[in-house]
Swiss-Prot record:
GO molecular function: calcium ion binding
Keyword Cell inner membrane assigned: no
A Pfam family hit: KicB
Leucine-zipper: region residues: 209-237
Subunit field text: Interacts, and probably forms a ternary complex, with MukE and MukB via its C-terminal region. The complex formation is stimulated by calcium or magnesium. It is required for an interaction between MukE and MukB.
Similarity field: Belongs to the MukF family.
Keywords of this entry: Calcium, Cell cycle, Cell division, Chromosome partition, Cytoplasm, DNA condensation
Protein name: Chromosome partition protein MukF
GO terms under biological process: cell division; chromosome condensation; chromosome segregation; DNA replication
Annotated localization: Cytoplasm, Nucleoid
Length: 443
């Protein structure tokens, strides 16, 4: 098998060198090729006239909002470019002068198939592919148990595994890679929604998160249902290769198929675990953003009520209740002591209260400088500078402390003007804040 592969590589390099491939597909050219491929699939003879290609190019040109004046010239350039790059074949003769016929080349079919068909990945398609694989491996295992010479093994075992099962495994693997790319695109969409107006984006974000989670779980359930059976069939064939040194190429193929199947199976669970972590991160960000915005709006309304007291008087009712004793805190402390026991001083961690006290003290010292020098406080810049000093796990707690301390020092004059401040990024993890400059300090 290795010798065959070593002979194939030089031949493939020579073949590529002889044909002098030079592939370049900008977005409009790629769209033109995809439209040609889809239109070609609807034709019974698989042949395209130049007038058909010009009509298809006109549709692409309109979508890309290109000029209509030079349409024919640009269409001819695009057609010649696809022919030159061997995406299209042009046929003409002296009997059909001025009337050329075009066919999509195998290269054009392969490129368009990658962008069109591989995006049609679903649990139904995966089930059908795995069903075909199961039938092929079942027939190959039966043929392996019957046994025969090397020619028999090549025709009845090696051939179906190599040219059917392996290709389907490669197709599934490619589809999974497309799913990875799709997840990255969904993450970019969610980040874009949250950075603009997260009030309206929460529902859309939740829908994107749920749809992706459901798709991943459906695909993984389909893989789990068939994976063990396929592995057992491959082991069944492998057991028939014992003491058959002349069939080493079959054994190597079985090992490669087992590795591909393991990679396909592990992808699903890994993708689910990563997506669950991302889902939790987005929900934590949304909850924290809601809390911070709720406190800011409450403080703004309270200040407006106090300032407008004489024009719109109001009464303040207060109530005081005895604090309820929460036994759960004591119980949790006892359970923690029983589970952990006594630790050496070097291994003891600071309590959360001590850590917050240290942070509050440091933040107060930083913000007091602005008040003493009568400089306005840009919360976005201060948050970004301070958060860079702490790990990501503490960003939301530190941000809340900074906002609380800044509000205690003073207020923003623009808050009275009903002007919404712009969103400012405060870290490298898509968090942002919306606040005016604090330029009026309490004396």
């Amino acid at each position: 098998m290795q010798n065959e592969l070593a002979q194939t590589i030089p031949e493939l390099i020579s073949w590529t060198k002889e044909r002098e491939f030079s592939l370049s597909l900008p977005s409009d050219r790629l769209a033109f090729l995809l439209v040609i491929s889809i239109y070609n699939n609807e034709q019974t003879d698989g042949e395209l006239l130049e007038s058909d290609l010009i009509d298809l190019f006109r549709y692409v040109s309109n979508v890309f909002e290109q000029s209509e004046a030079s349409l024919l010239q640009r269409a001819n350039n695009a057609i010649n470019d696809l022919v030159k790059q061997r995406f299209l074949n042009r046929f003409s003769s002296e009997f059909t002068e001025g009337l050329a016929i075009y066919r999509v080349t195998p290269l054009g079919v392969g490129v368009s198939d990658y962008y069109v068909r591989q995006r049609e990945f679903s649990s139904l398609r995966l089930s059908i592919q795995l069903s075909i694989v199961a039938d092929e491996i079942q027939r190959a295992s039966v043929a392996a148990e019957q046994g025969g010479d090397e020619r028999y093994w090549r025709n009845n075992v090696f051939a179906p595994l190599k040219f059917s099962v392996a290709e389907i495994f490669d197709s599934i693997d490619l589809s999974q890679r497309m799913m990875d790319e799709n997840q990255h695109q969904i993450r970019e969409q969610i980040a874009g929604l949250l950075s603009q107006n997260w009030h309206e984006a929460i529902i859309n974000c939740q829908q994107l998160l749920d749809e992706t989670s459901i798709n991943l779980r459906e695909l993984q359930d389909t893989l789990n249902a068939a994976g063990d059976k396929l592995q057992s069939q491959l082991l069944r064939i492998q057991s028939c290769l014992i003491s058959r040194d002349d069939l080493a190429f079959v054994d190597q193929l079985i090992v490669n198929l087992q590795n591909k199947l393991d990679r396909i199976m592990s992808w699903g669970q890994q993708a689910i675990d990563l997506w669950i972590g991302y889902d939790k991160h987005v929900h934590k960000f949304i909850r924290t953003a809601i809390d911070m915005d709720k406190n800011r709006v409450f403080g703004q309304r309270l200040r407006q009520s106090i300032q407008n007291y004489f024009s719109s008087p109001w009464l303040l009712y207060t109530a005081k209740a005895e604090a309820l004793l929460d036994l759960r805190d004591d119980e949790a402390m006892l359970n923690e002591m029983e589970a952990v026991g006594e630790l050496p001083m070097a291994l003891e961690y600071e309590s959360l209260t001590d850590v917050q006290t240290q942070i509050v003290t440091a933040i107060q010292a930083e913000l007091a400088h602005f008040r003493d020098t009568a400089q306005p406080i840009n919360l976005g810049a201060v948050l970004r500078e301070q958060l860079a000093r702490y790990p990501q796990s503490r960003h939301f707690d530190v941000a809340r402390i900074i906002v609380d301390q800044a509000v205690k020092l003073g207020m923003a004059s623009q808050d009275h003007q009903a002007v919404y401040p712009v969103w400012q990024p405060i870290d490298d993890f898509s968090a942002a804040v919306q606040a005016h400059l604090i330029d009026q300090y309490d004396k």
